[in-house]
UniProtKB/Swiss-Prot annotation:
Family: Belongs to the thiolase-like superfamily. HMG-CoA synthase family.
Residue positions where N6-acetyllysine is found in the record: 83, 118, 243, 256, 306, 310, 327, 342, 350, 354, 358, 427, 437, 447, 473
Species of the source: Rattus norvegicus (Rat)
Superkingdom of origin organism: Eukaryota
Modified positions (N6-succinyllysine) in chain numbering: K52, K83, K118, K221, K256, K310, K327, K333, K342, K350, K354, K358, K447, K473
EC number per UniProt: 2.3.3.10
First-level EC class: transferase
Gene Ontology BP annotations: acetyl-CoA metabolic process; adipose tissue development; cellular response to amino acid stimulus; cellular response to fatty acid; cellular response to glucocorticoid stimulus; cellular response to hormone stimulus; cellular response to insulin stimulus; cellular response to lipopolysaccharide
Metabolic or biological pathway: Metabolic intermediate biosynthesis; (R)-mevalonate biosynthesis; (R)-mevalonate from acetyl-CoA: step 2/3
Name of the molecule in the record: Hydroxymethylglutaryl-CoA synthase, mitochondrial
PTM: Succinylated. Desuccinylated by SIRT5. Succinylation, at least at Lys-83 and Lys-310, inhibits the enzymatic activity.
InterPro entries the UniProt entry points to: HMG_CoA_synt_AS (IPR000590), HMG_CoA_synt_C_dom (IPR013746), HMG_CoA_synth_N (IPR013528), HMG_CoA_synthase_euk (IPR010122), Thiolase-like (IPR016039)
MF terms in GO: hydroxymethylglutaryl-CoA synthase activity; identical protein binding
Database matches in NCBIfam families: HMG-CoA-S_euk
């Protein structure tokens, strides 16, 4: 198999292809030769300036082929009806059998993305994985994914795994954009992979699990552009959720502390983001304050769906406290009694929560509710949770509705690391445009979720017990029928006596 061309030779080849097609680098191939998402099939010619509009070109979502219904779990666990479905806002929870692990999830989602876009494997120059599902303390998931690039001869691929609870995917996305806007960029695309298996021991936390992976193709001239200079970040040392027991998949969780940490990080990230965007506006002659009115859609890391509704309400409270008295009285009806409070005094105030949820309900329905479809029906995907929300948002709106909008995003990982950032959506929603094709690519999300097999709580519990039994077991082949997997799914075929893992793929 031909080795990857050297960078200088590659750029010459790109120029020759462009010339033969009578195209400049700024244009696309003829319609008959276009890849999905209108992505050029060859690497981009590098220039001396920053590439324009770096962001998400294509997106792929993977989740397991089986789920347990939360109403069934409520009955099985002998809790009151609505504890999970209303209290947590969860309807179904996807889960993996012992045939799937973090490597197989990421293999599946990357191969699906590459096959759908028909992008040459040597067009990828960076691949980074965000995950907290650690099955080896040394060997990265990224090294396993390199198996997919073997036939292309492409071994010149930067990036490695990034880990900090649910934040690793966002760090990987930022790293990809930073690489592309640096002197180290060689003109090729970046792949960002986020994936996790969220499992808990039997008890109150188990219904907040889930599993899945998201792969994103990053490049210039994207339909979802990362807004430059607009990241508000907060990091601190906290033991709200952590995994010190390396012999178990299960975390240690301080639930109340974790919610407080999440909300505190949200407050501080939002303040930092507002400060930066207002500075940009001020330099452009605009002295208006930034509020949620300047964001058409808002997505969040989603440990459970009810948390997201509280988080949007929290952002409204930030806007309320920073606004003038006139605006507080006119724009934020029902919140007047709380204008003397400080943010840090309200994390456990149920009266504030109740008033905020009521005041922000219409905004939640317009800006955020559609983004929770995957989380509601599949559960918490940890690092990929935020980007599953992005896919859900795209799947529930037309390209015309999304065009020109700003999508705010809040990413949180316990321990803790958090960022508030934003995407600017392309204004071009015409048929065949990158935006229209990106939206179209995730339009089957509801249909795919409905195609999964419903498992009983007893079957779910048995599989959780199997995962405990086989965790770090050697010299075995996982039990199960591979025909129960979705077509094209990679699975763990065997673990040998030296812990080496072998994978196979179910035929498409």
């Amino acid at each position: 198999m031909q080795r990857l061309l050297a960078p200088a030779r590659r750029v010459l080849q790109v120029k020759r292809v462009m010339q033969e097609s009578s195209l400049s680098p700024a244009h696309l191939l003829p319609a008959a030769q276009q890849r999905f998402s209108t992505i050029p099939p060859a690497p981009l010619a590098k220039t001396d300036t920053w590439p324009k509009d770096v962001g998400i070109l294509a997106l792929e979502v993977y989740f397991p082929a089986q789920y347990v219904d939360q109403t069934d779990l409520e009955k099985f666990n002998n809790v009151e009806a609505g504890k999970y479905t209303v209290g947590l806002g969860q309807t179904r929870m996807g889960f993996c059998s012992v045939q799937e692990d973090i490597n197989s999830l990421c293999l599946t989602v990357v191969q699906r993305l590459m096959e759908r876009t028909k992008l040459p494997w040597d067009a990828v120059g960076r691949l980074e994985v965000g995950t907290e599902t650690i099955i080896d303390k040394s060997k990265a998931v990224k090294t396993v994914l390199m198996e997919l690039f073997q036939d292309s001869g492409n071994t010149d691929i930067e990036g490695i795994d990034t880990t900090n609870a649910c934040y690793g995917g966002t760090a990987s996305l930022f790293n990809a954009a930073n690489w592309m806007e640096s002197s180290y960029w060689d003109g090729r695309y970046a792949l960002v992979v986020c994936g996790d298996i969220a499992v808990y021991p039997s008890g109150n936390a188990r219904p907040t699990g889930g599993a899945g992976a998201v792969a994103m193709l990053i490049g210039p001239k994207a339909p979802l552009v990362l807004e430059q200079g607009l990241r508000g970040t907060h990091m601190e040392n906290a033991y709200d959720f952590y995994k010190p027991n390396l012999a178990s998949e299960y975390p240690l969780v301080d639930g109340k502390l974790s919610i407080q940490c999440y909300l505190r990080a949200l407050d501080r990230c939002y303040a930092a983001y507002r400060r930066k965007i207002q500075n940009q506006w001020k330099q452009a002659g605009n002295n208006q304050p930034f509020t949620l009115d300047d964001v058409q859609y808002m997505i969040f890391h989603t440990p459970f769906c009810k948390m997201v509704q509280k988080s949007l309400a929290r952002l409204m409270f930030n806007d309320f406290l920073s606004s003038s008295s006139d605006k507080q009285n006119n724009l934020y009806k029902g919140l007047e009694a709380f204008k003397g409070l400080k943010l840090e005094e309200t994390y456990t105030n149920k009266d504030v929560d109740k008033a905020l949820l009521k005041a922000s309900l219409d905004m939640f329905n317009k800006k955020t509710k559609a983004s929770l479809y995957l989380s509601t029906n599949n559960g918490n995907m940890y690092t990929s949770s935020l980007y599953g929300c992005l896919a859900s948002l795209l799947s529930h709106h037309s390209a015309q509705e999304l065009a020109g909008s700003r999508i705010g995003a809040f990413s949180y990982g316990s321990g803790l690391a958090a960022s508030f950032f934003s995407f600017r959506v392309s204004k071009d929603a015409s048929p065949g445009s990158p935006l229209e094709k990106l939206v179209s690519s995730v339009s089957d999300l509801p249909k795919r979720l409905d195609s999964r097999r419903r498992m009983s709580p007893e079957e779910f519990t048995e599989i959780m017990n199997q995962r405990e039994q086989f965790y770090h077991k050697v010299n075995f082949s996982p039990p199960g029928d591979t025909s129960n997997l979705f077509p094209g799914t990679w699975y763990l075929e065997r673990v040998d006596e030296m812990h080496r893992r072998k994978y196979a793929r179910r035929p498409v």
